[in-house]
Structures are given as structure tokens and as C-alpha cells.
């Protein structure tokens, strides 16, 4: 009997990720969470890897898990005005959380066997947009598409408050 498919969720303590975790946890397929802090809603089919997300950006981080599906629900909480104009001082942190970390996780998951990926992006995402927020979201979408996953699902909701 083949092993059950294993899912990885990054961002399971946020709005979208917590709802996704609740939905996936109702089944019996194994789920691995990558988190910066402990998730208080673990079930029998979930395991958790607590990390400093900056470690993802090093060449030495090893996921050590075979993955079938990956869900990227990471995102920096923003003030509404940052959707229209993001101050220079906030851009590095935003890019790290909304581009660098998700891309690193996607690449690691792909290296560990993931065939499909779903990401939470934003309506209006477009690399090259003069709006920094939409530019970074579009840049991530394009980078994810280039990795080689068999299936890519990009959700583009309006801004999540």
C-alpha cells in the first residue's frame, strides 16, 4: 500500500494558513508545518518544524521530509496605506517575508519531491508594477512557475486585513 501524500504548510498560524490547516487536519494525510512559533492546534496527523526563517536562506538548511504538496500562506501584516505606497524602510522586511522565504520553501519542497504548490498572492500582482507590493507578489508568482512543479495554484484574493 503506497504512503499517503504528505502536505507542507508554511504560514499555518495566520488567517489563511490556520483555516487551511483546520481543513486539511480533518483528514488523515500527514501534514508538516514550518513555523517560527509553535502552533497550538496540532492534531494527530500534523508535525511541526520550528525554525528561524532566515535559516531557509542559507545553503545548509535541510527540510529532511518527503513532500507531495506545498501550501505557502506566508505574508507580512501590512497597514492599508502600504498597499498604495510602501515606505523604503519597510521594503526589505516585506520582500524577505513575502518573496525570499516563500521561494526558498518552494525550492526545498520541490527538491524533496513536491509535485504541486498553492500560494496566496494578491489580486493585481504583476512583476514590473510600479507598486512595490504588487511587483513583489508578481515576482514571486513568476519565480514559483519557473521551479518546475507539475501543478501550480495561485490564489489572488483582495487584501487580507
Where are these regions (language model features)?
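N-terminal Rossmann NAD(P)H-binding glycine-rich loop of SDR-like oxidoreductase domains
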Residues: 2-27
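Short-chain dehydrogenase/reductase
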Residues: 10, 95-99, 130-138
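Conserved catalytic Lys-bearing alpha helix of Rossmann-like short-chain dehydrogenase/reductases
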Residues: 31, 99-102, 136-144
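Short, polar loop motifs at secondary-structure junctions
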Residues: 33-40
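NAD(P)H-binding glycine-rich loop region in Rossmannoid oxidoreductase-like domains
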Residues: 40, 45-104, 108-111
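Catalytic loop of short-chain dehydrogenase/reductase
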Residues: 118-136
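Conserved beta-loop-beta element that borders a ligand/cofactor-binding pocket
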Residues: 142-161
